[in-house]
Curated annotation (Swiss-Prot):
Its EC number is 2.7.7.6. Residues 1-43, 1294-1369 are annotated as: Disordered. This is DNA-directed RNA polymerase subunit beta'. It comes from Prochlorococcus marinus (strain NATL1A). Binds 1 Zn(2+) ion per subunit.
Amino acid sequence: MTSSSPKTRKSSTKSKAKRGSKSKKAAEIKAVQRLSKTPPPFRNKVVDKKVLKNLVAWAFKHHGTAATAAMADNLKDLGFRYATQAAVSISVDDLKVPEAKQDLLGQAEELITATEECYRLGEITEVERHTKVIDTWTETNERLVDAVKKNFNQNDPLNSVWMMANSGARGNMSQVRQLVGMRGLMANPQGEIIDLPIRTNFREGLTVTEYVISSYGARKGLVDTALRTADSGYLTRRLVDVAQDVIVREEDCGTTRSILISAEDGKFGNRLVGRLTSEQVVNADQEVLAERDTPIDPQLSKKFEQSNLQGVRVRSPLTCEATRSVCRKCYGWALAHNQLVDLGEAVGIVAAQSIGEPGTQLTMRTFHTGGVSTAETGVVRSTLSGKVEFGSKARVRGYRTPHGVEAQQAEVDFNLSIVPTSGSKPQKIDIPIGSLLFVDNGQNIDIDVTVAQIASGTVQKSVEKATKDVICDLAGQVRYETIIQPREVTDRQGNITLKAQRLGRLWVLAGDVYNLPPNALPVVSGNVSVKEGQVLAEASQASEFGGEVRLRDSIGDSREVQIVTTSMILNDFKLLEESTHSGEIWHLEAQDNTRYRLNTIPGSKIGNNEVIAELSDDRFKTETGGLIKYAPGLTIKKARSAKNGYEVSKGGTLLWIPQETHEINKDISLLMIKDRQWIEAGTEVVKDIFSQTAGIVTVTQKNDILREIIVRSGTFKLCKESKALDRFEGDGQIVNPGETIAKGIKTDSMVMVQSVETPEGKGLLLRSVEEFTIPDQAQLPELKHVKQPKGPSLGIKASQRLAYKDGELIKSVEGVELLKTQLMLETFDTTPQMTVDVEVIHDLNSKGDRLKLVILESILVRRDTTSDSSHGSTHTELQIENAQVVSAGDVVATTQILCKQEGVVQLPDAVDGDPVRRLIVERDEDTITIDSKGTTLLKVGQRVVDGDFVSKDQSIDACGEIENIDGKKVKLRLGRPYMVSPDSVLHVRDGDLVQRGDGLALLVFERQKTGDIVQGLPRIEELLEARRPRDSAILCKKSGTVDIKKGDDDDSVVVSIIEDNDVISEYPILLGRNVMVRNSQQVIAGEFLTDGPVNPHELLECFFTDLRDKKPLMDAAQEAIAKLQHRMVSEVQNVYKSQGVAIDDKHIEVIVRQMTSKVRIEDAGDTTFLPGELIELRQVEDTNQAISITGGAPSEFTPVLLGITKASLNTDSFISAASFQETTRVLTEAAIEGKSDWLRGLKENVIIGRLIPAGTGFSGFVEELNAEAGPHPDILAEDPAGYRRIQNLRPDYTVDMPSSPVAKNTAVLDDPSDEDLEATRSRHGIDPTTSNFAAFARPTGDDELSAEDQMPDPAALEGLQEEGLLSDE
C-alpha cells in the first residue's frame, strides 16, 4: 500500500510522542524472533483449553520462560479484551432442552413396560428385569447426551453453556446433560443403583421424590471430599518418609540391567521421554538409531515409533545399582527443566509429592451396580436379507443373556455368512469365541436385524455370586413346573436346602390363606364348600397342673387366666408393717418374739433359693472393724460364688479381734499424732477425725498423702526378752487363758499378742479376743413344707451365713454384722415360667395379717378379633369361672377360626408328622369362567399365561391354571408365574401355602465385580502398603500344563498343574470361585488360576520359587523383584490413568524401588548377618561376593516386599524411623542394638539441625565422606557414595584380600580381637613391651612410625603362619 488511509495518518501523528517506547518494544520483539530457531507455524483452528496448553508448552520449549510469559500475558489481554466487549454468561434461556427428549423417554417407557410385562408373565427373572431396566435407562441417557450435542451444534453453536463446556473453560458434558437432558440413574446409600431414574433436568425442575433421591449422592460427595483431603495428606507423609533419603549421589552406576518399555498400539507416548537408552537401539535394517546412554527426547521417541520398534530398553531407577541412592543416568531427565538431573537432587521427595498430590483428585467411591453388565461388546446387524449359514467349524451352545433373551454362544472361532436370495455378494462376519448369536443356522432374516454380539477380546472378567429375593405378590398355593427339577442339597452343617436345577417357573395360584394358631386343628376336610362365618379350625388351651382359677382383667388383645397350683400360709408368723422415712418395712414376728425383716414386698415375685426374710438381732454385731478367725470345728459349705456370704454347715466358735481403721486420703500435714504412739479413746488423730478406742496407732502414707490410720486396742507391756519379741513378730499369735507370754507377763483371758515398737521402746501388745458361738442349726419355729404328690411344691428352709472368710481384715470404723440367719424359699418340680407370688391375707381368728406364698400357672387367652388379613375372624370362649377348681389337663378356653368369605376349602399336602399350619379357601373372585367360541385347545390342569389361545381365534387375558372344562365353558383359577434361574434356592415346596410378601426363592446370579471395586485412593493405599487382600486369587506356583478335575463335593473342582518334570501340584478351588484357566492350557508361575484380587507377597514368592530352580540365587531374586516391580508400577499407573491423572513412571519407580530393596536372610552362612534380618539386596550381594572369594558359605535369602509404612520403619536411620511412627519401640530397639545413625537422609539431618545433604549441601556431604574414609580412600574408590556398611568395617583395620589362585584355600584374615592377639603373643613368647610391631599393632592415624619400626618381626610372622592367619607368601 502506497498511500496511507486517513485513519492511519491520524494515528501516526498521535504516536510520534510514543516512538521511543515503541522502538523499545520492537527491539524486544526482534530479540524474541532472533531466539526462535523455527518460525511459529500458522494454526488455523478453534483454540480450546487443550490447544492452548500445547501452544504454551511449545512456546516454553522453543523460546524459554521470558518469551512464554510475554505470550501468555498477551493471550490473557486478548481474552479479557473480547470478554469485555461481549461477555459469556448463563441465563435460564440458554438452557435449551432438545425436542427429541420426549420421544426418547417415550421409547424407554415402552421398552420398560414391555420388560415389566415379560416379568409378569414369568418369562424373565427378577434379576433380568432389573438389569434390563437399568440398561435401558443408561442407553437412553447416552442417546439423550447425543441429542443435546446435536441440538446445540445445529441450532445454537454459540450458546454460552455449550461454549463453556466445549472449550474446557468450565463444566463438562455430564453437567450439561443434567442441566438440559435428564439427571439419570442415582445410587442409594448402599451404592446400589435405584431403578427409578430422575427423568427431569434442572431446567425443568425436580419433583420432591426426585430431589430426595438425588440428595443421597450429593451428601456422599461432600463427606468424601473431606475424608479424601485427610487420607491424601497422610499418604503423602508416608511416601515422603519412605523415599526422603533417595538423592542423586552418583554420575553413573555402570549397570547393564534395564527395563523394557513396550509400545502400545505402535505408540510410546510420553513414556520414553526423559529416559536414557541402556543399549544401542537399531531398527529392522540394523541402522543405529541411538547409542547407549542417549537421552530420549520427543523427536527420538517419534523416530522409534516410525521405525516400528516394539520395545526399547531404557535405564530406570528400578535397576540402578547405586547403593541407597540413584545415579544421574538411571534417573534421566529432571522433569522440571527437561535436562539430565543434577547431583544432589532429592528425587525421592519429588517422587513422593508427585504421587501424593493428585490424591485429592481421586475418587473414593465404591459402586454396586446391582448386576449391570458393562461388557464392551459390539453389535453386528445384517446389511442384507438372506439365509444365515454357520461355517463348518461352528460349535455353539444355548445361552441366556443377562436380559433374559435366549441366544447361542460360540464355543470356537468361526465365520458366519448371510447368503442373499438375489445372488449378490454374501455378508461375512467373523465370530470370535464367546460371542452371542441371535439367529439360528439356516434361518431367513431381513435387513438390519441384530445377528450377533461380538465379544471384545478374551478378557476374562472376574465375576462374583450375588443373590436377589423373589417376593410373592399374592396369597395362594405354590405349584412347581416339572422342568425345574428341584433337588435337595445338604451343606457341611447338615442343613438341607432345595435348589432348582433348570430354568423354570414357580406358580402361585390365588386363594385366601388362613394362618392357624400354634395348637389349632382344622375341623373341615379338603374340597368342601364353606359359608361365611363357618368354623374352619379350633384351638384349645388346657391347664398343665390344675388348681384354683383366678380371672384377671384383660390387657391389650389378650386376657390372663391364673391357676393357683400350690399355696402356703406362714401361720406361725405375724406380718407387721412399719413406716419409716425411706418407705414401708415389713417384719415377720414369731411366737417367741424374734423378728425377721422381710426382703420382699407383698405383691412381688420370688424364685427358688431366694431369701424371703432375715433375722434381726444384734448378737453378732461388733462395735468396730477388725480381724475375723474361725476356731477349729467351724466349717462352711463350698459355694461357687461368695456374693451372698458363706453358708455354715457345722457350728462352732468365731474369734473376733477388734481394730479401728480410718480410711483417709488427705495431706500428711493434717496428722495430729505420731506413728506407733499409744493414744486414748477420743483422741483427735487427724483434723476432725477422732479415735473411738484406746490403743496403738499405725499410720500408712504414700507420697505425703495419708492413706490409713489403724488403732489396735489392748494393753501394751514393755518387754526386753528377745525370744518373746521374735515369737510374736508379724501378724502375732492367739494365746489361751493362763498361758505365760513372757517373763512376768501372764493372761487371764484369750488374747492376741503382737510385738510392736513404740517411741517408748519395744514391747508386746495384748489385744482382747471376743468369742461368738454359732449353733449347728438356726433356731427357727417349725416350718411346714407343702408337698404335692404330682406337680410343683414349695417350702421354707433356714440358713446361717457368715459375711467374711477366715483371716479377713474388715477395715471399718463402724461395727459390722458377722452372721446372718436367713429364711429361704425352696421349690420343687416347677417349670421355668412358674413364679412364686408373695401375698398378704387377713387371718380372721387372730385378727392379724399372715404371709401367703403362691405358685401360679399363667395362661394367656386370645380375645375375639373381627376379620384379620391372615388369621381370619376368631372367636374365643372361656370354659371356666372364677374360683373354680380345675384338674390337670382340663380345657380353659377354646378359640375358633371363622371363614371370612364363602368358597371351597383346600388343605395343603401333609408333610410327615408336621401339623397343618395354614389352610386356603378358593373364593369366587379367585377364578374366572371363559366362554370358548370354538373348539378349546386347552386341557384341565394346563397352566396358561396372558396371550395364550383358548380356541383358534380367541386369546386369554389372564394367567392361571385350567380347573374345569364344561362344554364351551372353561374355568380358570387365577395365578401368577415367577421365573427362577438354575441353582436358585427355593424357600417353598410344591403345594405350600404362601401369604402375600413371603419369600418364594433366592435367585443366585453372577455379576461382574464392579461392585466395591476399590478405586482411587484406597486402591493406591492398598498397593503401596502391599496389603494382603481378603479372598485373594489362587496363583500358580510353578509353570506347567493345566488339568481340571471334579472335587469331592458336587460343586468344587481341583486344578492340577503338571510340570515339565511330571511333578503334579494340586490346587483345590472352593465353591464360588471362578476358574480362570482351561484344560491343557500352558500356564506360567504367578498366573491366576481363579479370579480375585492378587496378593503381591504371594506373587513375589511364586516368581522367586519358580526362578530359583532355573537360575542362581542372586539372579532369581533380581528377576523376581523386577517382575513384581513392573506389575506394581503398572497397577498404580492404572488407578491414576483411570482418573485422568498423568504421573511419570519414574516417580512411581523410585517408591517401588524402596519397597523392594530389602531381602530376608534365611541362612546366614559364614556372613555376619542374622537369620530373619532384613538387609539391602546390594549389601547382601557385596558380602556374598567377598565371602565366595575366600571360599566361605554365602548367605541364603528370599526377596521381600515391604509396604511404605513398614519400609519407613525399617530404614537404616533410626532417627528418621522414630520420627515417623512407634517412636518408643524404634528408639528402644536402636538403643539395645547399639545402632549408629549415619545421617544420610534429609529427615535425620533436619531433625538434629544440620545442613541437608541435598542441593547445595551435597558438596559438603561428599567432603565429609572423604574425611570419614580417612586413610582408606579405597573405600570410596569402589563405593563412591560412601555407603559401605561401616558398622561391619572397623575404620582402623583393613584387610587386602589375597588375589592369587594359590590363595583360594587360604583362610580369611578376619579382624582379630585384642584377646586373640594377646593369646598369639603369649603362645610364641613375644614380649609386647619390647616388640611394638606392625603385625600386632593397629595403625592409629597419628602414630608416626619409622620405616624400620614398620618392618614386621620375623618371629611374629612365623607365629602368624603357624596359627594359619597368614599365607606362606
